[in-house]
Amino acid sequence: MRRRKYEEFEEDNGTVLRYARHDNGGGFVESHAHVDPAAYVAENAYVDRGAVVGAGARIASAAWIDRGAVVHAGASIGTTAHVAAGAVVGRDARIGARAKIGAHAHVWDGVRVDSDDVISEGSVVRAGSQRSRAA
């Protein structure tokens, strides 16, 4: 079966979002997002409108980078993880599988967020700081 080159979704307000496949990995990138060509976006991952993904970043299968989120160079986002709207993931940070980074949260450079962890909306996670655990 031939793989589709793009997908379109219509939002409740009538806005049509068009997602094209990224050359490195085949994941879906919305036309108003910016993903560096050297970043890897796995086939079932989505990068939403206004999001930015830096060089060498890795977005795993079924991960979702929400509107306006930033994933800096060298960061890694685990399988089915969600980086919410406006959140920032620093350089070389590692977000584990199924982790959830809340809206407008900031995960600093080099920080490791464990699988299944939940970072609250607006939180700032620095290296060595306490992280919220999922219930």
Roles of regions detected by a PLM:
Residues M1-V70:
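Extended, small-residue-rich solenoid/repeat segments and analogous flexible loops
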Residues R2-H22, V70, G78-A135:
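C-terminal segments of enzyme domains that contribute to small-molecule binding surfaces
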